[in-house]
């Protein structure tokens, strides 16, 4: 299987199913049944099946980013959970992952918009991935909203969350290495579980060069990190 092939190459496959309503088109008709009994049964079955297929991986990424109306203006069908419903569904997903003996993992951008609520309600057991794809990291000179995006790395550290900071070559070519440089200083090593790159290009032939560039950036950042 593909998972066996990946492991033979020394890679650790981690499942990711994004349950945010902005990104759940993969659920097909069930994406239009959000927060119903049928939806919860389907999502629980999916999490259990994927957990078994991946052989009880260390982590399970649940997505949960960008669930705001502003991110869905180009979609013909838009739905947004918020307030207690969003948190209730997140806790449901977390519980289903933990039932399978796996640590849940989410994107952290909810904290950009409602930091007080986030830090009051987000369990420390959930691995966090803040993301920022720009080129500047100086909090003294950054303008909003970029300053908020970068500062969240520091805020997650201040509140004691484990992190996998995320960079990208989606917008600029130097972001990933700069992300590593910044977070190596901002995050305690005991809470820095790694880094992730997200080129946000499909795995198609015409995008191959962008993926190669991303891999090269990771390699360069690793060499600098290990010095």
Language-model features: locations:
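Glycoside hydrolase catalytic-domain groove-lining segments
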Residues: 115-169, 175
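Polar/charged alpha-helical tracts
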Residues: 52, 99, 151-154, 158, ...
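Aromatic-lined carbohydrate-binding surfaces of glycoside hydrolases
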Residues: 1-127, 132
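A generic secondary-structure signal
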Residues: 49-53, 96, 155, 181-186
């Amino acid at each position: 299987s593909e998972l066996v092939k990946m492991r033979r190459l020394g890679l650790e496959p981690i499942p990711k199913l994004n349950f945010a309503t902005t990104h759940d088109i993969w659920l097909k008709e069930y994406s239009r049944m959000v927060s119903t009994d049928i939806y919860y049964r389907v999502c629980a079955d999916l999490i259990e099946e994927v957990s078994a297929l991946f052989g009880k991986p260390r982590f399970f990424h649940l997505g949960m980013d960008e669930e705001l109306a502003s991110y869905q203006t180009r979609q013909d069908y838009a739905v947004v959970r918020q307030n207690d419903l969003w948190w209730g569904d997140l806790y449901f997903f977390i519980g289903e992952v933990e039932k399978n003996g796996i640590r849940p993992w989410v994107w952290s951008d909810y904290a950009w918009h409602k930091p007080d609520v986030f830090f009051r309600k987000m369990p420390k057991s959930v691995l966090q991935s803040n993301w920022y794809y720009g080129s500047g990291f100086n909090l003294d000179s950054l303008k909003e909203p970029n300053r908020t995006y970068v500062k969240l790395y520091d805020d997650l550290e201040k509140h004691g969350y484990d992190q996998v900071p995320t960079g990208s070559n989606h917008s600029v070519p130097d972001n990933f290495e700069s992300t590593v440089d910044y977070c190596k200083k901002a995050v305690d090593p005991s809470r820095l579980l790694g880094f992730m790159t997200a080129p946000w290009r499909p795995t198609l032939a015409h995008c191959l060069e962008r993926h190669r560039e991303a891999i090269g950036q990771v390699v360069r950042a690793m060499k600098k990190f290990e010095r």
